[in-house]
Amino acid sequence: MKPNLKQWKQFMLFGICAWGLLFLVIFVYFTDSNSVEPVPSAFSYVESKKHFPLQGKQRAIMGAHQDQLFSYAIDDQDLLKEGILDSFIVGPGSMKKMAGADNYFESEQEFIMSKKTQKSTSNNHEDDDDEIYLHKNIDSVSGKKAPAYGKRYYHDTQRQHKKIRRNMQRKKQHMIEDSYDWNGFSSSMSKSFLQKLWKGNVSSKMLTPRLQKARREYLRANKLGVNFNGKQNSRKLNPQELLCVLKDRAQVKTLDGKDAPFSSLGWEKYFPKIALNKLYPHGFSTCAVVSSAGAILNSSLGAEIDSHDAVLRFNSAPTRNYEKDVGNKTTLRIINSQILTNPNHHFTDSSLYKDVTLIAWDPSPYYADLHMWYHKPDYNLFPPYEKHRKRNPDQPFYILHPKFTWELWKIIQENSNEKIQPNPPSSGFIGILIMMSMCRTVHVYEYIPSYRQTDLCHYHEQYYDAACTLGAYHPLLYEKMLIQRINQGTEDNLLRKGKVILPGFSSIHCPIKDHIT
């Protein structure tokens, strides 16, 4: 009987040890599997909104458009409370100094944007309970039980509790996000992507599948017959070299009626007698280029914009009811050919197009065949232009020569590592280069988005699409990387205001013989 009793005791002891081991394995398993799934990148999204077609006559009007996934908005004070914005204030210099951004952006995958909102009382209590629970368990395990389990178990437990803490923080973030009133704002752009865009270091592979597909389709379609025979620069030009290339080649050219078919049609009398590059003989000291992007809402940039000597706006972007954010002054307005031909824009009677210098443009074939373009423009801007000139002969109103827009396209392509869309640059990029030819300093607002980045295409329209910021028809992504390379503004200006500061051509000093190509 005694041997049996002894065996029975051994069996019971073995069973207790086995149960203890099983309990420990189950505990470790469930602790590991409790991690919150990381939020998928916004660039692997499944589209849930109905988008306008990316091709044909639904060509984007403005050069700053966007893709719908989440609805986020943000406020200065939220970031100030978290101490995030302060880490970006490093004064003038290169974007390479954005060490603070690197640290911040490593924490999460998504660019979480928020409006000022208070957490609910229940959420506060839950947070407190989580913290109390965590501290109690850390104390009990690491403080009292660690010696009993040995150093290895102690370190394993520490790692487990770090993981628990991260999971709690993610849980809190999701609770806070759920409590916000997103108010229709959206951004499908990840934080890491935005950071790279600020540094001018992104590629088409980082775009959403939809925008990648749109880019491939435009490359394949090549509607305008682009046959680029140039070559990409063998090395990346430094900012000064790139500025000299722009100064040398981005010479603003408008139609003057002296080229066929306009010369034979008697159009010379309709075009202004004074060339655009001589319209303001003394130029301007400082100028503002105001993007129509939704990110400019809630910026309070209006007074700063109006303080400039000249202000350029785009298409049908209004100022009325938006003065606080976009200002009220307008000196020049660039208009896409759709503005002249679409009755919804009221080109003939809207005050937006009066008492300002107008600059219109329309995509032409790549080789700038004026005959072909005149008889088959993308949108037939010529009849409304003629009508407007007859009614308002004293208003400066120009049509850009296609050679100018395609020369800008060539510069972008030569300084990009990938094939860009075979379509003209956006109105935004065209406007920036025109103002660089007129002003000593150019301040560009929300062309490269600030932390207020949103998928709201235009501040005055309720339409959301990531193509508005990153490009579908226009090679916007590559335009913005080029502009960022020559940006002389501070990191803080770009982060808070979406402001890029560029030197005008008159203030750029280049070698007389410059072989930079």
UniProtKB/Swiss-Prot annotation:
In alphabetical order, the GO MF annotations are: beta-galactoside alpha-2,6-sialyltransferase activity
- What InterPro entries does this protein's entry cite? Glyco_trans_29, GT29-like_sf
A GO biological process of this protein is:
protein glycosylation
**Residue numbers on the Lumenal membrane side:** 32-517
Q: List the disulfide bonds.
A: C244-C510, C287-C439, C457-C468
Keywords (alphabetical) are: Disulfide bond, Glycoprotein, Glycosyltransferase, Golgi apparatus, Membrane, Signal-anchor, Transferase, Transmembrane, Transmembrane helix
The question of whether Hydrolase is a record keyword is answered with: no
Any one Gene Ontology cellular component term annotated for this protein? Golgi cisterna membrane
Q: Where are the transmembrane segments?
A: 11-31
Chief location of this protein? Golgi
- Ligase as a keyword of this entry, yes or no, is no
**Which compartments is it annotated to reside in?**
Golgi apparatus, Golgi stack membrane
Provide the membrane topology annotation.
Single-pass type II membrane protein
Q: Which reaction does it catalyse?
A: a beta-D-galactoside + CMP-N-acetyl-beta-neuraminate = an N-acetyl-alpha-neuraminyl-(2->6)-beta-D-galactosyl derivative + CMP + H(+)
* Side of membrane Cytoplasmic, spans: 1-10
Sugar attachment sites are N201, N298, N328
Report the EC code(s) recorded for this entry.
2.4.3.1
One Pfam family for this entry, by name? Glyco_transf_29
Q: Which family does it belong to?
A: Belongs to the glycosyltransferase 29 family.
What does the protein in this record do?
Transfers sialic acid from the donor of substrate CMP-sialic acid to galactose containing acceptor substrates.
Name of the featured protein: Beta-galactoside alpha-2,6-sialyltransferase 2
